[in-house]
């Protein structure tokens, strides 16, 4: 995960259709909390993302990453929701906002 490029600022990619549908279907309060988290991430370096205890960036071992992607990661996007994403150079490419904790890890 962390490498010599850990001090590179994160560039968010929110253009995944599933991610957008999940995000915009959240209740207003939760949606605003998610947007606050995304705004926070946008100001961080990758090293800060890896160390941030609130985000809890962690590799998902129970879900196979698509071809060309090293790994899928989960991160806390609101107090009760986790999102999935992967790193692509400086980009954090968002994939989903899970309806519940277990579905983030492919258990449902």
Task: Describe the function of each predicted region.
Residues 1-81, 87-108:
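Basic, Lys/Arg-enriched alpha-helical interface segments
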């Amino acid at each position: 995960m962390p490498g010599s490029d850990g001090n590179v600022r994160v560039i968010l990619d929110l253009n995944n259709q599933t991610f957008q549908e999940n995000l915009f279907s959240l209740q207003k309060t939760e949606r605003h909390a998610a947007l606050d988290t995304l705004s926070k991430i946008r100001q961080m370096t990758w090293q800060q993302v890896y160390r941030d205890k609130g985000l809890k960036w962690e590799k998902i071992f129970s879900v196979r990453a698509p071809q060309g992607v090293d790994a899928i990661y989960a991160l806390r996007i609101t107090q009760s929701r986790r999102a999935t994403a992967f790193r692509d150079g400086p980009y954090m490419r968002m994939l989903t906002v899970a309806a519940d904790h277990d579905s983030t890890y492919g258990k449902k």
